């Protein structure tokens, strides 16, 4: 059974058949920021396109990068060929085609794949390789898609590709909750779905009974969808909505209305106080058992009105969960860590004082100076004297740096963890609330940010070497924060200069836990889009001053009419109204027991589009509303099982539970060290050999082909890992692979599967593993795990071999439980063994496997109980650990 999003399933299909795609191994998938940053790094290539300014607005490079990403994503998901656009007589469309081509070239040159390309590449694979499609269809007999109203053109194409002749396709959705037009989604997919089949083939089952909401709430959002359907608002639903009325499951015996308003009149302070009184009244009445029963929904949580309300509530003891409100860079722990980093580079601080960095705005100068002031204030405390002295020593060292350090910026951050307050923050117990853990999670996030900067710009140490008249350490210190100047070479420098500035401007979302969408002890502040699929006992809807706005461009409308595979479905003039009503229908329908519409009323708020429904509501301060009549539901648990593997979880926890907590629970990013490129290269090329054997193409397993596969893997690996092997190392790796192929040449037919991802669902968690090779004849199989090293001494290295044996025993358990195959033996194959027997073999012993699985289970439950006090016993493990400064080892 395949379970996942369209993107996750497409990514799985791509990885399982990578050799047939246009990608190379070790491709990198871009998130939204990475995509924009990649375009930004190459903006000079786009600006060199003839008539570029007719397709993209004349603004700053970063905003142009974002606009380009929006355009190419839309075009890609509609399967538009850039050559077709480039041939158009309209210079705007021709330029747009060139933009798409340049963008696709950049992805290809750098072995990158963006979010949209995941689906387009899977579609290309399945339509160009019928055998792959046939294999997939033979595995998939039934398809069920939820939220079908939010699918786009390419997703519809994929659904019917998967479905094939079986046509066993079930889609579920609510056309009134179609919110993702800006991502290419179209409501037509669900409205026209029955038309894809012959008469009588498609059964439509209306789902109109609502089991979530109080009947007043159901009546309210039913009325919302029809009250504004008329000439007064200049649009009608017509065929663009299923004609339906949602029916409540039952009508509670309440006299008080379940839909009310809470407002002030042109007085923001009064509005804050009324909301505070509302929440405090719920608590004092005993009706509220947890703040997480309340959710505030906004069009945007980044608006100053929203962040001011959040700060007001938090200042009055009410914790607010608002991970997308762009508060990350304002959190005290982040300001302190940035300020301390800057103090360790006095030349950069001097530049700030002299306002030398032309690409920083006054807002950025204020922010960085504020961070430095916060750091100086903290360090002035006598209790911070050790930390202060350490920063002074580092600043002096970096100011007069003569030779490269053995650390970069990430390394400096980890060194700071020796001192308070960072050491105290990292010591926070994992069983406390989300707000208490937020500082630790934010510090973990800043390690991710700095680590990615170092990766993108190939920085691993602080280097005093001079380049173009300046020390590299000074150039690199300026690059994450802001400084650069004109020309193409300078543009590259400018790109690096703006990294942290761009993140600051765009905002970073704080930690979100998929297993706890409404954290206990917090009121939730969410966007309406973010709340989709959720439900809350009490929902407070703000943003009532909002109005319908056009979200399409004239250029894209022209392209759609000429080149999209099907004409526009909804009238362009009505789209903004459709989207507006669907958005707020979604907001109103999140409420279970009580729906509150709130605003600070003024001349424009509520807007004319809400005024009628809003004016008819009872004010919650009215005698007609009695909170004591209500019983509020509790927030439902999200039953998501965590996944554990032996190598990534159990082995790490057994080595050091503290390290496990910091890396696996809090998601700190390790300081980037040289990847184990040698081992990866050997493994990937052996995988190529095995795949050829599994395709019954043993004739391709020749020294020449192996060398070609090896070279291709080395090229993609060195590019993705940003590290390289000297010629003797490459030759040694290739010799290991050729030796393996020679030794196994007579037994390729025994291979059953290679690089097997396998998982097993237990009662409260999931075990997973990746098996290098499964081979065998008859009714039994043998498991093989490859090690790209010489065979160890079985006596001196007993502990390491035992750990590998336990890993194989876990794999044996997974294979037997999932496939029913009997495992007879398990092998460690050492490709570096050039003279003797390259394997260490273990017989399958049921009692030993069961004992290992019991140990695995015990360790998992320690992790689930948040038992993270045990530290490493091995001095070697501590010496190699990034957290050695924090632990004082």
Map each language-model feature to its residues.
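Helicase P-loop NTPase motor core
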Residues: 199-203, 209-318, 346, 376-389
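ATPase/helicase motor core of nucleic-acid motors
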Residues: 196-199, 257, 284-443, 447-451
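Accessory C-terminal helicase-associated subdomains
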Residues: 93, 112, 287, 384-530, ...
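C-terminal accessory regions
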Residues: 376-381, 519-520, 563-618, 862-880
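Conserved helicase core region in the C-terminal RecA-like lobe
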Residues: 2-12, 144-147, 172, 498-555, ...
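Conserved helicase NTPase motor core
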Residues: 2, 28-39, 89-192, 203-217, ...
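A basic/glycine-biased coupling hinge at the interface between accessory DNA-binding modules
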Residues: 1-120, 167
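Mg2+/Mn2+-dependent nuclease catalytic core
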Residues: 758-852
């Amino acid at each position: 059974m395949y379970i996942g999003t369209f993107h996750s399933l497409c990514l799985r299909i791509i990885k399982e058949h990578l050799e047939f795609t246009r990608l190379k191994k070790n491709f990198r998938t871009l998130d939204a920021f990475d995509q924009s940053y990649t375009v930004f790094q190459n903006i000079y290539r786009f600006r060199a396109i003839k008539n570029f300014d007719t397709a993209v607005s004349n603004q700053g490079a970063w905003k142009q990068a974002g606009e380009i990403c929006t355009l190419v994503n839309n075009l890609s998901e509609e399967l538009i060929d850039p050559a077709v656009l480039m041939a158009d007589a309209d210079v705007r469309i021709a330029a747009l085609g060139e933009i798409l081509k340049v963008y696709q070239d950049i992805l290809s040159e750098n072995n990158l794949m963006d979010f949209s390309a995941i689906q387009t590449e899977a579609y290309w694979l399945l339509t160009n390789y019928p055998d792959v499609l046939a294999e997939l269809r033979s595995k998939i007999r039934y398809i069920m898609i939820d939220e079908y109203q939010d699918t786009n053109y390419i997703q519809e194409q994929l659904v019917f590709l998967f479905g094939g002749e079986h046509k066993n396709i079930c889609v579920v959705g609510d056309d009134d909750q179609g919110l993702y037009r800006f991502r290419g989604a179209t409501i037509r997919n669900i409205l026209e779905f029955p038309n894809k089949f012959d008469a009588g083939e498609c059964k439509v089952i209306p789902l109109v009974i609502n089991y979530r909401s109080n009947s007043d709430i159901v009546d309210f959002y039913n009325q919302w969808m029809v009250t504004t359907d008329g000439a007064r608002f200049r649009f009608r639903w017509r065929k663009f909505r299923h004609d339906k009325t949602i029916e409540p499951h039952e009508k509670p015996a309440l006299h008080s209305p379940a839909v009310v308003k809470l407002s002030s009149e042109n007085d923001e302070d009064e509005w804050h106080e009324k909301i505070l009184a509302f929440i405090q009244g719920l608590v004092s009445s005993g009706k509220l058992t947890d703040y997480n029963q309340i959710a505030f929904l906004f069009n945007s949580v980044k608006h100053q009105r929203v962040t001011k309300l959040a700060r007001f509530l938090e200042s009055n003891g009410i914790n607010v969960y608002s991970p997308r409100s762009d508060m990350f860079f304002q959190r005290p722990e982040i300001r302190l860590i940035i300020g301390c980093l800057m103090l360790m580079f006095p030349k950069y601080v001097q530049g700030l004082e002299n306002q030398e960095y032309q690409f920083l705005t006054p807002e950025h100068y204020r922010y960085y100076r504020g961070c430095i002031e916060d750091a100086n204030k903290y360090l002035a405390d006598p209790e911070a004297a050790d930390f202060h002295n350490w920063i002074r020593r580092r600043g002096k060292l970096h100011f007069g740096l003569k030779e490269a350090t053995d650390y970069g910026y990430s390394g400096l951050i980890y060194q700071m963890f020796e001192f308070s307050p960072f050491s105290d923050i990292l010591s926070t117990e994992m069983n406390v609330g989300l707000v208490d853990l937020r500082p630790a999670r934010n510090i973990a996030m800043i390690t991710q940010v700095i680590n990615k900067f170092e990766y993108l710009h190939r920085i691993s140490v602080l280097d005093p070497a001079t380049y173009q008249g300046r020390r590299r350490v000074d150039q690199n210190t300026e690059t994450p924060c802001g400084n650069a100047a004109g020309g193409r070479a300078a543009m590259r420098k400018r790109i690096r200069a703006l990294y942290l500035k761009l993140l600051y401007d765009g905002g970073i979302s704080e930690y979100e836990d998929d297993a706890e969408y409404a954290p206990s002890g917090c009121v939730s502040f969410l966007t309406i889009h973010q709340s989709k699929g959720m439900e809350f006992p009490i929902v407070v809807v703000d943003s009532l001053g909002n109005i319908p706005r056009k979200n399409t461009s004239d250029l894209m409308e022209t392209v759609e009419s000429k080149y999209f595979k099907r004409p526009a479905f909804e009238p362009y003039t009505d789209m903004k109204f459709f989207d507006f009503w669907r958005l707020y229908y979604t907001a109103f329908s999140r409420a279970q027991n009580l729906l509150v519409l709130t605003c600070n009323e003024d001349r424009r708020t509520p807007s004319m589009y809400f005024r009628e429904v809003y004016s008819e509501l009872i004010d919650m301060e009215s005698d007609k509303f009695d909170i004591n009549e209500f019983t509020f539901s509790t927030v439902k648990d999200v039953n998501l099982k965590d996944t554990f593997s032996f190598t990534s979880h159990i082995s790490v926890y057994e080595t050091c539970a503290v390290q496990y907590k910091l890396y696996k629970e809090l998601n700190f990013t390790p300081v980037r060290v040289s990847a184990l490129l040698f081992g990866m290269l050997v493994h990937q090329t052996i995988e190529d050999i095995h795949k050829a054997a599994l395709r019954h193409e043993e004739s391709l397993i020749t020294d020449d082909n192996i060398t070609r596969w090896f070279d291709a893997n080395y090229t993609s690996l060195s590019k993705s890992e940003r590290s390289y092997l000297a010629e003797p190392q490459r030759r040694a790796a290739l010799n290991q692979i050729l030796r393996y192929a020679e030794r196994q040449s007579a037994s390729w037919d025994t291979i059953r599967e290679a690089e097997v991802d396998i998982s097993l669902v237990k009662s409260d968690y999931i075990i997973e593993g990746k098996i290098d090779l499964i081979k065998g004849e008859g009714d039994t199989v043998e498991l093989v795990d490859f090690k790209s090293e010489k065979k160890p001494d079985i006596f001196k290295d007993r502990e390491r071999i035992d750990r590998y044996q336990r890993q194989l025993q876990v794999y044996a358990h997974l294979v037997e439980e999932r496939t029913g195959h009997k495992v007879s033996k398990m092998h460690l194959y050492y490709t570096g063994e050039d003279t003797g027997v390259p394997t260490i073999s273990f017989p399958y012993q049921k009692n030993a496997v069961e004992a290992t699985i019991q140990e695995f289970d015990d360790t998992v439950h320690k992790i689930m109980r948040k038992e993270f006090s045990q530290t490493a016993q091995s001095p070697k493990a501590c010496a190699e650990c990034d957290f050695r400064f924090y632990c004082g080892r």
